[in-house]
Design a protein with these regions (language model features):
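Hydrophobic positions in alpha-helices of CheY-like receiver
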Residues: 117, 149, 197-201
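Catalytic core of bacterial c-di-GMP phosphodiesterases, primarily the EAL and HD-GYP domains
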Residues: 68-141
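Mobile, glycine- and charge-enriched loop segments
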Residues: 146-153
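Inter-domain helical "communication" segments and dimerization helices
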Residues: 1-22, 66-69, 87-90, 118-119, ...
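Residues at or immediately flanking beta-strands
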Residues: 20-22, 56, 92-96, 126-128, ...
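Charged helix-capping and loop-helix junction motifs
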Residues: 111-115, 143-144, 191-196
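EAL-family c-di-GMP phosphodiesterase catalytic domain
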Residues: 1-7, 11-16, 31-32, 44-50, ...
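A short, well-structured catalytic beta-strand-centered motif of the EAL phosphodiesterase domain
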Residues: 22-59
């Protein structure tokens, strides 16, 4: 895997992104209807027959700045894919993309994202940008980017929230439209704390997407605490964009 990771990083650094970067989609489901309402775009590295998970190369690209061209490339390819879907089938789905602080530090990020969206005739209201990490005192450009994205109609989410303490610290920086709870929130040792966190979220009226849904007990527990949306192996693993198109973007018969 080390050789494959090196290949992916080199593809980004040499601007040969199409040779080493691709994306998959993990469907997001309405928990009450067991219906797919969209999907999360997830970057993957590719080298020969190997699929390289993002944890192998993202941190390195964040250090070198390669995350910027890679992020733009994935966003552009995802927008093109979504734009190719039948008009009637892309009016309602929600697609989520992960955005790092390094990207948000770039003052031109929101302008590029909105320009790409406009060129593909896509509506901002169909997208959620998940903020994957941030420091307690972000640069001014971060808030400016979030402002511009929000004003344009893109919904924002804090990603990977695993505790009430983390949630409150994130909301002190920016109040988002969604909270994405980490899969660890559903483990037996954390579930009671998760219920308390959900009670707090319900009081401030923010929608939740829960990761790591693996059984019907998870579904019923989340529904009882006001969670509408989820993703996990009970519904689907991350799948190729071609599979997502065939499975979830076809007209009802």
């Amino acid at each position: 895997m080390e050789k494959s990771t090196h290949f992916v990083v080199q593809c980004v650094e040499k601007n040969k992104l199409d040779a080493g970067i691709d994306f998959v989609i993990q469907p997001i489901f309405d928990l009450s209807r067991f219906a797919c309402i969209g999907g999360e775009v997830l970057v993957r590295g590719t080298h020969r027959r190997n699929i390289v998970p993002p944890n192998c190369f993202i941190s390195q690209l964040e250090e070198t700045g390669g995350i910027l061209p890679m992020g733009d490339y994935v966003m552009a390819q995802a927008f093109k894919f979504i734009a190719r879907q039948p008009q009637a089938l892309r009016e309602n789905p929600l697609f989520t993309l992960n955005i790092s602080q390094v990207q948000l530090n770039d003052a031109e990020f929101s302008s590029r994202a909105l320009d790409m969206m406009q060129k593909n005739n896509l509506s901002p209201r169909n997208f959620i940008f998940e903020i994957t990490d941030i420091i307690d005192t972000p640069e001014e450009s971060v808030c400016q980017n979030l402002d511009q994205l929000s004003e344009a109609g893109i919904q924002l989410a804090w990603d990977g929230i695993d505790s009430l303490e983390t949630l409150k610290s994130r909301l002190a920086i920016w109040t988002t439209d969604y909270i994405k709870l980490d899969r660890s929130c559903l483990t037996a040792g954390n579930i009671e704390k998760t219920f308390l966190m959900l009670d707090y979220i319900n009081e401030i009226d923010i929608d939740v997407i829960i990761e790591g849904v693996e059984n019907y007990t998870h579904v019923s527990a989340m529904l009882r605490h006001g969670v509408k949306y989820g993703q996990g192996f009970l519904f689907s693993r991350p799948i190729s964009k071609e599979h997502f198109h065939q499975e979830y973007m076809q007209p009802e018969r």
